[in-house]
Amino acid sequence: MTELKKIPSPSHPADEGGNTIEARFAHFSKNDLRLDDDKFLAQATKLLDESKHLLMANVPALGTGTLDEAERYWFAFVLYSVRKLSENGDSVEKGLNLCQILRAARLNIDDFYKELYQFLIKVGSILSNLYGGDWQKRLEAKESHTNFVHLFCLSKKYKNAYRELFSIVNANNDKQLNVANASGCESDYYRFGWLLFLALRVHVFRPCKTLVSCTHGLVSVLAILLIHVPAHFRNLNLNDSERIVMRGDKADLVASLCNMYGTSEDELRKTLEKANNLITDILKKKPCLASECKPANLENIVTDGLVYFEGLMDESSLSSSIYLLEKDYDAATHDMDGLDEMIFLNENDSLLGSGSLSGGATNSYGNGTKRKLDAMSSPAKTITSPLSPHRSPICHSNGFIVGGISKMASTPVTTAMTTAKWLRTVIAPLPSKPSAELEKFLTSCDRDVTPDVTRRAQIILEAIFPSSGLGQNASLMDNIWAEQRRMEAMKLYFRVLQALCTAESQILHANNLTSLLTNERFHRCMLACSAELVLATHKTVTMLFPTVLERTGITAFDLSKVIESFIRHEESLPRELRRHLNSLEERLLESMVWEKGSSMYNSLIVARPALSAEISRLGLLAEPMPSLDAIAMHNNMSCGVLPPMQALLKHEKHGQNGDIRSPKRVCTEYRSVLVERNSFTSPVKDRLLALNNLKSKFPPPILHSAFASPTRPSPGGGGETCAETAVNVFFSKIVKLAAVRINGMVERLQLSQQIRESVYCLFQKILSQRTTLFFNRHIDQILLCCFYGVSKISQLTLTFKEIIFNYRKQPQCKPQVFRNVYVDWKALRRTGKSGPDHVDIITFYNEIFVPAVKPLLVEIAPGGSAQSGSQVPEAKNNTNGVNPSSPRTSSFPSLPDMSPKKVSAAHNVYVSPLRSSKMDALISHSSRSYYACVGESTHAYQSPSKDLTAINNRLNGNRKVRGTLNFDDVDVGLVTDSVVANSLYVQNGSCASSSHMVVKSEQQDS
């Protein structure tokens, strides 16, 4: 069996002349960056020296693959890492920030972050040896990247709002610029506003810089500008009844801005007060009540509660105000190592180059797939997934439609504001204690568990939203923010818990739910899910997923048990938050449940005893949960930085609450729901399947079984234990997710149905017979290898480069999937080979995949036992009355969302989703309004079922309809049911008879 061969990385030509990489790094640091801190440079040189062999091995995978660019990336990575992780407090080190490093290296910010994740995976063990095992938390790479993405979105929001509300002018000469032709908002007023916003971020928001709070800050700045910028430069039409809120015969400015940008009026007024205080403190301006001084600028505007600063925008003082704000920002951020946030004033800054978000928005956390910023508000392809159920928006008695019907484009900022509105209007008014109906269930247990439930909720939510866990950086506002988030999460928790108890009692025909309501792990999962939705709504920078798992002591596998039930029983949940939970569940399935420490392995050793030795050898088992008392102790420690949760673990007794390492819940329901994988994008099609016809066939899942002991007999019978049932259900979800991704890749690669079924069959066999291949890996790594292996045994001219090229176009693609695959060389000692812990996909294929699955590949090869056994020849004599031309039964699972759907019971009318291959070419930002796509609404949160009517009304409203379709005419040539049925399957075709794997040598596409 021929192996893939890699082309060796080129050596640096300059090395032969004695000009070493260390010398070039020293020149870069001292000459380009002007660094003279010998201690800092010594640490950076040491990291470079220990990692340079990894640089030379990965030159083709960095940037465009040139040696010079790869070195510049590596130098930037090294300096940034040492700057963040070093404990040296010298002034030179403190003066170095990311923007300075990237300017010297001629790199832009977004490309830097995209490649940084690959660097950290490669050098992780080196960083751990040099800086300790907590280096990832101290480096805060994901948090820093998220902060950049948020700032970019906020800067775009500010620019668009400014252009909408003001003429673009220069205060010095009152020269009005052409808004349409201006590349940036070249205005002193514009600059003043952004600098005031940065002052709010530095002095007011500080650690809790959420997207929601920052948006309130941005809108408060707009309010100050509207109050002080001369009225003849305003574009705001006070007679616009759709946008302006009138109080009597005058416009309410604050209420109008809330109406326009979805902010809370109470929060906006509080933020506006803080912004006014900054103007007083930094600019030394004297405030006065607008109602008393009655400036001409506020004619026809309600002045109650507004503050006015005389001369704030005068030409004589504006320049000095800008200077003071810049000076204040520089002083406040001098010791910081992150972004210089003033770069967003110039959208043509080289740091916001064509490869960055200014030209293409990237998926957060290392996704290399680039999208235009407009794609964040326009649809992006969504892959289906067999996860959680979908609910249509619910209209409540208070008249609030979840999410609202908004005309604003769905951007990260508007999404955050609309989901925050749901928290304010639906969740915030709820009581912060169990309702009477919930108390009925809590008191109906063998003992009253109400005190336990409330105490646990307080402790766990205090751990997730700590009041004093930030040491000297803590402030009153931080504590107020944390308390507000705790209340929101607690109210949501009680609300969903009540709905779950009601559903369980109906299934069991009893109100005594002792086994469920006394289960510690169940409650922590529910609290974690509630807190995650609150965090996702506010879009925090410092508490990204999986923070809720770490602070509650549960694992990804645990959380996956409640996601479906949470979505099912909270009908008011906005569509964006349902998508967020669905994307989390997909993230859990594809990789997180396979990571070390997943409680899935604790169930797997019971369900599959043969795997226990390998699981134990790799140390994959999950640790017991920390006790509630340990978490409470952790919360009460207020000195400096809190110690790791693991240091305070008190192992719970075996058997408490069943078994705290319980397996996946029993679930016999067939689930086929689709997942949107990036909460920053709105999908073209959710492809959410209607489950109404399935609910009558399958009973809803019983949560009692989800958290039962692994060795307990399954309530479903059949002689299975709960662990076996859990693993079977979990594997079925993995297979369904794989089927969806296989289907997407087959469509992109334009492969036959036979290849699709072979890849699917091979994946199934690997999951059941070679399960260890998934340990510590991503399921897409196995899928990519399956595609290549099947293409070789089928004698297709399909290269790994083509496979990876098309995989890059998949929405879930992350470069680390094919660049960094885990390999356990200890298990290969017999071969005498060794290497790094993470290798590229080709090395993994050659060294691990082929030796493990070669027998399985032979089975599915043309003429193999599995393949031949699955092919049923077409019957020549139809004795059962079946149509001879009926398609053969496919082993590939049905994906109804990809097939035409009959939408009329009386007529042969079908609606089919736009396929991805056509969608990529057709749907651009300028043309997307011409298409109606499944799952995308014409208005925010509106049910997609209303879309066709809305589009028809829009198209037909201004023109006469010259004729109508005659559905009763049999000669009009409509497609019949039989034609559609036959079109869904590809007829059996001939295939190569050879079962040998012909594998060509090729270079991996990186």
Curated annotation (Swiss-Prot):
Residues 866-898 are annotated as: Disordered. Pfam families: DUF3452, RB_A, RB_B. SUPFAM superfamilies: Cyclin-like. Residues 411-604 are annotated as: Domain A. It is found in: Nucleus. It comes from the Eukaryota. GO terms for molecular function: RNA polymerase II transcription regulatory region sequence-specific DNA binding. Gene3D superfamilies: 1.10.472.140, Cyclin-like (1.10.472.10). Its main location: nucleus. One of its GO terms (biological process) is cell differentiation. Residues 411-855 are annotated as: Pocket. Coiled coil: none annotated. Residues 725-855 are annotated as: Domain B. GO terms for cellular component: chromatin; nucleus; transcription regulator complex. InterPro entries: Cyclin-like_sf (IPR036915), RB_A (IPR002720), RB_B (IPR002719), RB_fam (IPR028309), RB_N (IPR024599). Keywords: Cell cycle, Nucleus, Repressor, Transcription, Transcription regulation. Regulator of biological processes that recruits a histone deacetylase to control gene transcription. May play a role in the entry into mitosis, negatively regulating the cell proliferation. Formation of stable complexes with geminiviridae replication-associated proteins may create a cellular environment which favors viral DNA replication. PANTHER family: RE32990P-RELATED, RETINOBLASTOMA-ASSOCIATED PROTEIN RB -RELATED. This is Retinoblastoma-related protein. The lineage of its organism: Eukaryota, Viridiplantae, Streptophyta, Embryophyta, Tracheophyta.
